[in-house]
C-alpha cells in the first residue's frame, strides 16, 4: 500500500499509520461515541419515571447536550487542525465519561441537564464526527476519501446497532444508573485506540487559504454553497435527534413494547451500515449533492408513513429499516463536499461549523418534540414538520455547487465575520425568498394545527403558538 500521507514528515517519534489502522481507530471511536449517544432514547422513560420529571425536561437536557456539542465543535476542530486530533479526542472522552458518571448520581432535572447536557455535550464536541472525519479525511487521499469517510461513519451505526439493545438489557437487569457503567467502560477503551489519528499532514493543499482558520472562514462564509450546506445539515440534525431521542416513546405511545422500541433504534443502526457503505461507493461515482437530495426526499416519505400508516411491530421495524438506510448516510457526503470545496488543511474547523448547524437543528428536534408531546400527548405534528423539512432539504441541495471555490469563475471574496452568519445570510437576495417561504410554511402548519385538534379542545389555540414559537427564526409573530 501507498500510505496516505506521502507528504508527511516521518521521524522516529511519528510514523505514518497504515490505512487499516486509521479506519479502525476512527471507526472504533465513532462506534463508541455515537453508539453511547444513540442510547439516550432508551433512557427517557426510566429516568423520567425514576426522577419524576417530564418528557420535556429530559428533552431539554438532550437539547442542551446537542447545543453544547455543536458550539464546541468548531473550537475542537480548530484545535485539532493545529495540534492534532488524538489529543482532542482523548480530552473529549474524559468529559464524556465524567458526564455519564455525573448522570448516574443525579437526582433532579437540573442534575440531568448539567451531566447529560453540558458535560456530555463537551465530551461529544471532542469525541465525534467533526474531529474524527476531519482526521481521516486528511490522512486518506482523495481517490478513496469518500469510501473512507463512509466506512468511518458506518461504524457509528454499528455502535448504535450493538449498544442500544445491549443498554436496554442492562437497564432492565440492573437499573438505569448502573447501566451507565457500560458506556463509561467502552469510552475508556475508545480513548486508548485513537493514537493512529495523531499524524497531521504538513502539505499545503492548493485550495487551502493562507493565514490560518480565520482566513478560510472568511472565504467559506462568502461561498454560497457552503452556507447552503450549513442550512441543509440543520435539517439532518433535526431529523436524527428527534428520531433518536423520541422514536422509542412514540412507538410506546402507539402501543408497542419497550423491547420493540429499542429494537427499532437498533434496526436503524443496522440498516445504516449498509446504507452508508453504499452511499460511500455511490459518492465516488455521482454528484454528492444529488445523492443528498435523494436521501432527504426518502426521509420525508418515510416520516409521512410513520403518521398515516397504522403502527404494528412489523411496520415499526420496516419503517426503521427504511429510515436506517438514509440515517447517517448524509454525513460522509456532506463531509466530502466540504473537502472538495476547501481541501483538507482546515477540515476540522470547517466541519465544526457544519456540525454546529447540525446541532442547532438537533436542539430544536429534541427539545421541541418533548414540549410538543407534553402539551398534546402526541408526536404526530412533529412527524409532519420533519417531513416538510425533508422536502426543503431535498430542494436546497439541488442548488449547492461541489466545485473547489478557487475553480469558480467568480471565486467568493473573503467576508468579514464580525457581523455574524445571520447577517450574511440575510443580505442575500435569494435568502429573503427562503425566509419568506419558511414563514409561510410555518403559518400553514399553525393553521393545520387547529384542524388536527378537536375544535373543543383548549389546547387548539396553544398548539399553533408553540409550533410558531419553536420554529420561526425570530420567535412567534404578534
What are these model-predicted stretches?
Residues 38, 66-74, 160-161, 269-277, ...:
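Residue-level signature of mid-helix packing/kink "hotspots" within the transmembrane helices
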Residues 31, 99, 111-127, 234, ...:
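Hydrophobic core of transmembrane alpha-helices in multi-pass small-molecule transporters
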Residues 152-200, 378:
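Helix-loop-helix hairpin linking two adjacent transmembrane segments in secondary transporters
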Residues 116-154:
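Cytoplasmic helix-loop-helix junction between adjacent transmembrane helices
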Residues 71-109:
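Conserved MFS/SLC helix-loop-helix module at the cytosolic interface between two early adjacent transmembrane helices
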Residues 72-84, 276-287, 373-374, 477-478:
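Helix-to-loop junctions at the C-terminal end of transmembrane segments
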Residues 268, 286-337:
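C-terminal transmembrane helical hairpin of 12-TM major facilitator-type secondary transporters
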Residues 40-44, 223-276, 365, 440-456:
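Extracytoplasmic gate region of multi-pass secondary transporters
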Amino acid at each position: 500500500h501507498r500510505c496516505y500521507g506521502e507528504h508527511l514528515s516521518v521521524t522516529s517519534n511519528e510514523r505514518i499509520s497504515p490505512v487499516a489502522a486509521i479506519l479502525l481507530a476512527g471507526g472504533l471511536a465513532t462506534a463508541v461515541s455515537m453508539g453511547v449517544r444513540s442510547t439516550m432514547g432508551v433512557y427517557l422513560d426510566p429516568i423520567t419515571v425514576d426522577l419524576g420529571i417530564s418528557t420535556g425536561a429530559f428533552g431539554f437536557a438532550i437539547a442542551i447536550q446537542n447545543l453544547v456539542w455543536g458550539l464546541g465543535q468548531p473550537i475542537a476542530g480548530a484545535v485539532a487542525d493545529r495540534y492534532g486530533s488524538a489529543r482532542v479526542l482523548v480530552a473529549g472522552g474524559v468529559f464524556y465519561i465524567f458526564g455519564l458518571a455525573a448522570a448516574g448520581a443525579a437526582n433532579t432535572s437540573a442534575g440531568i441537564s448539567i451531566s447529560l447536557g453540558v458535560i456530555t455535550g463537551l465530551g461529544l464536541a471532542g469525541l465525534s464526527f467533526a474531529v474524527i472525519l476531519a482526521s481521516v479525511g486528511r490522512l486518506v487521499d482523495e481517490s478513496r476519501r469518500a469510501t473512507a469517510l463512509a466506512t468511518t461513519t458506518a461504524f457509528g451505526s454499528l455502535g448504535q446497532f450493538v449498544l442500544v439493545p445491549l443498554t436496554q438489557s442492562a437497564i432492565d437487569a440492573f437499573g438505569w444508573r448502573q447501566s451507565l457503567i457500560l458506556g463509561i467502560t467502552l469510552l475508556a477503551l475508545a480513548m486508548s485506540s485513537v493514537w493512529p489519528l495523531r499524524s497531521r499532514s504538513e502539505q499545503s493543499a492548493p485550495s487551502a487559504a493562507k493565514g490560518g482558520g480565520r482566513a478560510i472562514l472568511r472565504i467559506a462564509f462568502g461561498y454560497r454553497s457552503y452556507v447552503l450546506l450549513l442550512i441543509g445539515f440543520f435539517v439532518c440534525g433535526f431529523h436524527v435527534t428527534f428520531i433518536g431521542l423520541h422514536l422509542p416513546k412514540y412507538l410506546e405511545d402507539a402501543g408497542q413494547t419497550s423491547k420493540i422500541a429499542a429494537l427499532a433504534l437498533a434496526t436503524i443502526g443496522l440498516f445504516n451500515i449498509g446504507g452508508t457503505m453504499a452511499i460511500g461507493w455511490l459518492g465516488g461515482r455521482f454528484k454528492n449533492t444529488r445523492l443528498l437530495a435523494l436521501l432527504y426526499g426518502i426521509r420525508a416519505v418515510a416520516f409521512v408513513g410513520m403518521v398515516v400508516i397504522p403502527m404494528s411491530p412489523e411496520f415499526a421495524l420496516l419503517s426503521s429499516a427504511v429510515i436506517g438506510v438514509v440515517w447517517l448516510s448524509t454525513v460522509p457526503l456532506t463531509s466530502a463536499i466540504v473537502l472538495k470545496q476547501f481541501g483538507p488543511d482546515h477540515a476540522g474547523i470547517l466541519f465544526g461549523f457544519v456540525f454546529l448547524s447540525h446541532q442547532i437543528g438537533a436542539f430544536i428536534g429534541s427539545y421541541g418534540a418533548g414540549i410538543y408531546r407534553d402539551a398534546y400527548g402526541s408526536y404526530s405534528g412533529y412527524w409532519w414538520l420533519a417531513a416538510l423539512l425533508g422536502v426543503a432539504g431535498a430542494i436546497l441541495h439541488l442548488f449547492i455547487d461541489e466545485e473547489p471555490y478557487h475553480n469558480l469563475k467568480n471565486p467568493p471574496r473573503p467576508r468579514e465575520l464580525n457581523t455574524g452568519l445571520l447577517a450574511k445570510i440575510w443580505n442575500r437576495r435569494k435568502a429573503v425568498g427562503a425566509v419568506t417561504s419558511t414563514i409561510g410554511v410555518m403559518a400553514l402548519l399553525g393553521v393545520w394545527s387547529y384542524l388536527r385538534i378537536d375544535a373543543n379542545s383548549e389546547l387548539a389555540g396553544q398548539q399553533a403558538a408553540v409550533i410558531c414559537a419553536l420554529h420561526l427564526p425570530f420567535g412567534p409573530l404578534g
